[in-house]
């Protein structure tokens, strides 16, 4: 068929959460008819929880998201984006106000891609205010891609054999007409459609008010407020910053590179850290690897090899 699960709910004006949940599903071989933009899971609105799903073997994205305050956790995504380019296993983009989303404790590996390639987590066209915490990325072309966004947090992740682990650009500053139309027209209209200077947006996302002066000055929007901290990069190219972005705009701290983190069994893709791992010395927090993926419940009474 085409896409797997589509979900919307909640109120973006008031940031009222729907509290819908997509949990413990095995989604595979989707996008069979339409090869692009038919993800395993598509969600919109406010406050959904996407947990403990196994999603694999799709030609395009596994999860596409829009909206606010979604929690994406304990999912296992692999062999995604096999027939497309400029795509992410997880994808969102092009709205300053879609913030407060959290991706934590997911395992993403073996993303494919043609042409421009693929990303593990793709924050496209200035997607902002997203937390990427405690995930494991292995064999991803680009593991985390921040395309001009602001106030994103990349923390406590493990990157193995990715090229690069993190890439950040400043496309919001590009003077070319195509980017000015996207930033100054499309994204400005979406920003103005939300009353971001009054609650709940002004209190929940105070950084939004810092964007308005840049529009007044007509100088483009820089990728400020991004944080890359306490990550492990092993066997990977580490960090690429370019296309109008500068390292001075980004907080980069306490990351471990080019040192063996002492995985339990790298060859078996068991990326739990041994108790004597040097990563703990700079404050790295244990990732609950044993909780990632499907689990046994009243609907799933056994886990087959294909469920892991």
Where are these regions (language model features)?
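Glycine- and acidic/polar-rich repeat regions and solenoidal domains
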Residues: 1-270, 288, 299
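Long, compositionally biased
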Residues: 305-308
